[in-house]
């Protein structure tokens, strides 16, 4: 007979595992905190056993890491708490510690304490924010957060708001679907085979537009890359010429993607001028502000987003500049009804009729059914820091980027690619010992890559990008970056530069 009086002990089990994991993750973060005071030297320090302490990463190539990791999954019984702790310990050990000050590689960096808490809360709730009745509080939070964020960008109509998506690429993809189904409604039923659409984006824009074109069945050939000016901003005259050319070829100009904070140089496209072209030819105007959109919280820097209020849709990803945990992205608009018209379906098993005129079953606005409530992560960060706190953090990051840029500019051994101060938080530059560029692009690229690799052994991780003179350094500063980190980075670069020439 079944034991109907059997009790669950999940809370006790969770408490036990949480305390065990806490004993691993807190030292992981603390190690990064304690290492930050040493970054100003530009090199690693030794521990009591005279071993170099690289809190950032233990670098191994894939095959070597596989051999050391020895990760397998059990065929029969699980490994229990001991096996779990062993695996978590190894994951922490062999992962990049993004909490370390030396992580300056990508547009995303570490999260922060409130970010970790938000992930725990979402894990506890483990619900789907597709229909209101299974996620009432989270649905309200997403609606309010999306509406409030939209208002910051100048979207103030009664139907303004936004939805959260799983990253900037997902937001951009959703915007393209909404654009097609809004401007050409027959596509929702019949597909787009009756049209040869043309999508326009800067040649410095993110590759997610190509991915979106593939996903929507438009193909890579539908994406037209617009040249940029010397400053990296989209050339509006060239855009207009390319639109006219596309029409002459029998194509249907559908959509222009302007970028507010390009991936490499951090440049902001001229939004007002691009909007004028979109109006002239009846195209959807989207702004990809995944990276640069967060400066809307800064009175000092938000002028770079002038014209964003004219967009039909706008992407912002707080998991980048604001250190909200990945993933957290919003697609905002002045007209959420266009999202509903483009994406809603008659699924009676899921969506039930209500007397409320406002859409609360948020899956009707998105491309997804299963969707995590990432908006909570932004909401909790906003509650914790406040808009003023976001502003201070952003202004600090820009100050650090400008300081690094000034150090580079004053040195005879480096040459800036980005202006001083940079438009966003990327500082791009070449190594030019004695003021001389290498004799070939290949040699410049070799030096750049060799220096990047050597800097990992000094506790700094950053990237490089192709340029007209070969690969150049691309260092991304973030809201947590300290002055000593910036100065230590430069000292390290000076030292490793002498080793590669």
UniProtKB/Swiss-Prot annotation:
A Pfam match: Pyridoxal_deC
Q: Which residues bind substrate?
A: 106-108, 474
Q: Source taxonomy lineage?
A: Eukaryota, Fungi, Dikarya, Ascomycota, Pezizomycotina
Family (UniProt): Belongs to the group II decarboxylase family.
Pathway terms, separated by semicolons: Secondary metabolite biosynthesis
| GO molecular function terms attached to this record | aspartate 1-decarboxylase activity; pyridoxal phosphate binding
* Mutant phenotype after disruption: Impairs the production of destruxins.
Tell me what this protein is called. L-aspartate decarboxylase dtxS4
Modified positions (N6-(pyridoxal phosphate)lysine) are: 320
Q: Which domain of life is it from?
A: Eukaryota
Q: What exactly does this protein do?
A: L-aspartate decarboxylase; part of the gene cluster that mediates the biosynthesis of destruxins, insecticidal cyclic hexadepsipeptides which induce flaccid paralysis and visceral muscle contraction in insects through targeting the calcium channels and vacuolar-type ATPases. The aldo-keto reductase dtxS3 converts alpha-ketoisocaproic acid from deaminated leucine into alpha-hydroxyisocaproic acid (HIC), which is the first substrate for destruxin assembly by dtxS1.
């Amino acid at each position: 007979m079944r034991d109907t009086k059997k009790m669950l002990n999940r809370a006790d089990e969770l408490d036990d595992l949480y305390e065990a994991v806490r004993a691993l993750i807190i030292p992981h973060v603390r190690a990064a905190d304690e290492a930050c005071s040493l970054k100003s030297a530009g090199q690693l320090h030794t521990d009591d056993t005279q071993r170099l302490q690289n809190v950032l990463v233990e670098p191994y190539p894939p095959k070597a890491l596989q051999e050391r990791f020895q990760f397998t999954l059990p065929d029969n019984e699980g490994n229990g708490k001991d096996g779990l702790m062993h695996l978590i310990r190894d994951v922490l050990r062999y992962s990049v510690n993004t909490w370390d000050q030396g992580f300056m590689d990508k547009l995303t960096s570490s999260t922060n304490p409130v970010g970790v808490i938000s992930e725990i809360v979402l894990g506890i709730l483990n619900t789907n924010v597709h229909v209101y009745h299974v996620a009432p509080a989270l649905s309200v939070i997403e609606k309010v957060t999306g509406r409030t964020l939209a208002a910051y960008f100048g979207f103030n109509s009664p139907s303004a708001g936004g939805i959260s998506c799983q990253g900037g690429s997902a937001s951009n993809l959703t915007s393209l679907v909404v654009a097609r189904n809004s401007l050409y409604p027959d596509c929702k039923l019949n597909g787009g085979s009756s049209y040869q659409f043309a999508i326009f984006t800067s040649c410095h824009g993110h590759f997610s537009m190509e991915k979106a074109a593939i996903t929507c069945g438009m193909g890579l050939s539908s994406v037209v890359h617009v040249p940029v000016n010397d400053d990296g901003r989209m050339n509006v005259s060239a855009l207009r010429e390319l639109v006219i050319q596309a029409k002459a070829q029998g194509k249907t100009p559908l959509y222009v993607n302007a970028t507010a904070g390009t991936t490499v140089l951090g440049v902001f496209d001229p939004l007002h001028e691009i909007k004028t072209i979109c109006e002239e030819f009846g195209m959807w105007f989207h702004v990809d502000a995944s990276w640069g959109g967060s400066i809307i919280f800064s009175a000092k820097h938000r002028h770079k987003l002038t014209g964003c209020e004219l967009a039909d849709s706008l992407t912002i990803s707080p998991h980048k500049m604001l250190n909200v945990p990945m993933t957290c992205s919003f697609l905002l608009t002045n007209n959420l009804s266009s999202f509903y018209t483009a994406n809603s379906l008659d699924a009676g098993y899921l969506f039930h009729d209500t007397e409320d005129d406002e859409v609360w079953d948020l899956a009707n606005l998105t491309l997804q059914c299963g969707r995590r409530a990432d908006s909570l992560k932004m909401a909790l960060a906003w509650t914790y820091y406040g808009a003023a706190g976001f502003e201070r953090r952003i202004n600090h990051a820009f100050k650090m980027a400008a300081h690094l840029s000034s150090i580079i500019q004053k040195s005879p051994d480096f040459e800036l690619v980005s202006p001083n101060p940079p438009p966003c938080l990327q500082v791009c530059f070449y190594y030019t010992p004695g003021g001389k560029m290498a004799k070939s692009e290949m040699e410049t690229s070799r030096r750049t890559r060799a220096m990047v690799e050597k800097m990992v052994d000094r506790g700094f991780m950053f990237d490089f990008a192709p340029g007209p003179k070969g690969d150049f350094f691309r260092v991304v500063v973030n809201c947590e970056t300290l002055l000593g980190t910036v100065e230590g980075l430069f000292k390290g670069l000076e030292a490793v530069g002498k080793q590669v020439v």
